């Protein structure tokens, strides 16, 4: 969301009005839970998304990095749109491709900004997940913390979780919420 806009309007509108108002640069839409199961691994290193994003933005302002940051935002939006389509169409090949593309965009942003978005342990989380058949990337802004793995058909989930644990990565017992009326 556009935090500057939110800061400007939050004192002039009630919470209810604010929640119902259209927000610039924000779209919230319900997606059915993906057919591939979602697994989350924690690296044991907490990270702050607001701090990482602020650091990247601060380095990007006004310099050559500003164009790279704008390109990152544009390319990420395109990637997200393609991922949503792939999930809606239940296209595992495209899901894998877009998760990989998102990871590449974040890694490139980290290199451009000089901020470690993908730590060695987070990189290992992704590598292990891919070795076991999942599509994976860091979650949030990166910096350590958690990674997600979309376990596509054929993923060896128990093997992946065991390998994560052997690498010091804790599999978290989380799941995507599903409304009772959507249950099979």
State what each model feature region is:
Residues 140-145:
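Short Gly/Ser/Thr- and Asp/Glu-enriched loop/turn motifs at secondary-structure junctions
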């Amino acid at each position: 969301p556009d935090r500057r806009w939110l800061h400007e309007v939050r004192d002039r509108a009630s919470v209810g009005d604010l929640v119902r108002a259209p927000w610039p640069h924000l779209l919230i839409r319900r997606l059915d839970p993906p057919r591939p199961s979602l697994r989350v691994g924690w690296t044991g290193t907490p990270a702050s998304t607001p701090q990482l994003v602020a650091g990247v933005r601060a380095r990007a302002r006004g310099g050559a990095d500003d164009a790279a940051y704008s390109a990152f935002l544009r390319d990420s939006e395109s990637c997200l749109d393609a991922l949503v389509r792939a999930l809606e169409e239940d296209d595992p090949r495209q899901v894998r491709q877009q998760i990989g593309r998102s990871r590449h965009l974040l890694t490139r942003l980290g290199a451009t900004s000089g901020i470690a978005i993908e730590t060695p342990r987070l990189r290992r989380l992704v590598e292990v997940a891919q070795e076991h058949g999942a599509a994976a990337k860091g979650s949030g802004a990166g910096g350590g913390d958690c990674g997600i793995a979309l376990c596509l058909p054929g993923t060896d989930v128990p093997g992946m979780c065991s390998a994560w644990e052997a690498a010091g990565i804790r599999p978290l017992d989380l799941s995507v919420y599903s409304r009772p009326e959507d249950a099979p």
